[in-house]
Curated annotation (Swiss-Prot):
GO molecular function, a single term: structural constituent of ribosome
HAMAP family: Ribosomal_uL13 (MF_01366)
Location of Citrulline modifications: 59, 140
Coiled-coil ranges per UniProt: none
Signal peptide residue numbers: none
Native source organism of the sequence: Oryctolagus cuniculus
Protein name, as recorded: Large ribosomal subunit protein uL13
InterPro entries: Ribosomal_uL13, Ribosomal_uL13_CS, Ribosomal_uL13_euk/arc, Ribosomal_uL13_sf
Gene Ontology terms: biological process: negative regulation of translation; translation
Annotated family: Belongs to the universal ribosomal protein uL13 family.
Length: 203
């Protein structure tokens, strides 16, 4: 991948820890990474156990002044961000710079809805977990521990998918028309295409 190019990853269907480890390595190497659809990230193990773990984490606070930390993020994107932070030397200049190169989002906001999104095969649930194993969704966990925007994110995602469908339909139609147009003029331009082929300008 070219230096300075932004790597846009679709978090849906990836395992939390495995994806976080790969993202942490990439940002340390100097790549800019954007992770979208964090609410679709999976966690191995059944939902109830994962919720108990998170509730235990919520109880960890400073007795005399809880506002001093530790801070418990509720949004799936921030939970993922904190997981990555735990894999970086974030108290050093290098680690802080790496963390600044990471952006995380719930849903797919513009301009990333128009960009090609990648997956990480090494972190995919279907590749890494046995089909019989239980797993939980980060979005559901976040919702049950205090995230307020699950419904809003779902609505916006539905709207985005509808828009994408219309765009794809138009694109297919244009491609069909282009092919038809090429077919219509094929005989007329055959002598020109033959000349171009002899000069190696057309394959």
């Amino acid at each position: 991948m070219a230096e300075g190019q932004v790597l846009v990853l679709d978090g849906r269907g990836h395992l939390l820890g495995r994806l976080a480890a790969i993202v942490a390595k990439q940002v340390l190497l100097g790549r800019k990474v954007v992770v979208v659809r964090c609410e679709g990230i999976n966690i191995s193990g059944n939902f109830y156990r994962n919720k108990l773990k998170y509730l235990a984490f919520l109880r960890k606070r400073m007795n005399t002044n809880p506002s001093r930390g530790p801070y418990h993020f509720r949004a799936p994107s921030r939970i993922f961000w904190r997981t990555v932070r735990g894999m970086l030397p974030h108290k050093t200049k290098r680690g802080q710079a790496a963390l600044d190169r990471l952006k995380v989002f719930d849903g797919i906001p513009p301009p990333y809805d128009k960009k090609k999104r990648m997956v990480v095969p090494a972190a995919l649930k279907v590749v890494r977990l046995k089909p019989t194993r239980k797993f939980a969704y980060l979005g559901r966990l976040a919702h049950e521990v205090g995230w307020k925007y699950q419904a809003v994110t779902a609505t916006l995602e539905e709207k985005r998918k509808e828009k994408a469908k219309i765009h794809y339909r138009k694109k297919k139609q244009l491609m069909r028309l282009r092919k038809q147009a090429e077919k219509n003029v094929e005989k007329k331009i055959s002598k020109f295409t033959d000349v171009l082929k002899t000069h190696g300008l057309l394959v």
